């Protein structure tokens, strides 16, 4: 009996030793596994993977990557800290008084709205339409050759325009380049040039306006539509917000047009090389000097565009841009009033000067490129990845115009703080483009968030085995 008891005790000790050995072995394995997991090097991301992840993110969040929206004014409250003793949120900035039915002011560097009034009110754009005409024409590959010569269609000759309509003087026995045609629209608002652009591009005004409407629809402009290419029709419609967004996209795509077309103070047409037969055409003389309709080119420092417009149904409109010290702003003012044409132009000038002075006096860009270099990796638990590469560095998925800059009040950089909201670990499965965190730029000691940049997973990461999930679960204990 004694020998039997000893045998059982011995067996139990052996069994316990074996169990202890297994437990210690498993613990050692888990410890080693978790140690490797914590030292995991992030997976490399190819350009193809990055592009695919961003496309997935934008698609799921219904964001137009090619034509992002403006930054909502709710994300940029009008606050100003003029003293280090005053919290930034304590002072409200005073907006300029603008005598118009509608306006909006944006920072072109970031797409941030700085001021607005009735910005969604639908108003005929008048000759601002010609900006969309220029854009639509340049979208067609054959019209990107600005030196291309053509003959103005008879339907677009100046003599057939309504009385009082602006023109450059297209007529018979003439030829001109695409560049001259665009300059005629941009500088002196030639309605004959706008009609010629439509006919040359699509063969008919109806087909061309369809292209115009397709272009603005692609940009997400829901209230903007066109019935003609010149802006003479009161049936054309837009809003200050949407036209500011269009103007910004136009400048992003064709920045060279500012110098080539929109900052030109005057043009002469027709010139000698435009006349095919050396005789006057329908009374048009050579070298007719036509000044720019944008009178702000000479009255606002740094002003280099864009376009003015007027019909009785709309009032005095302008899409204005100016740049100084690397800061560019865009203002769209619609429905300016005036008892006379001269008074209307004067008020438009005063409104424009007020908005641009307000912009340049108060706002600037804050470079956040260095801050946006995320070096912190996220460990992935319960995946099928090699333990040594079970981590990734998230991608920035900024749907705004620029993730490189932030619009701030002058001298307020010291009040800005960056907050990275990102988990240290995350469970598989994950898909490329999945948002897993964000960067926030805030005003210190306030609840004001100036900018949010989503952080997304760059890879498709599959779920691992039950055993992998089990041992990864010990991550938090080491």
Can you describe what each PLM-predicted range is?
Residues 23-40:
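Membrane-interface motif at the C-terminal end of an N-terminal transmembrane signal
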Residues 10-14, 179, 259:
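Alpha-helical transmembrane segments of integral membrane proteins
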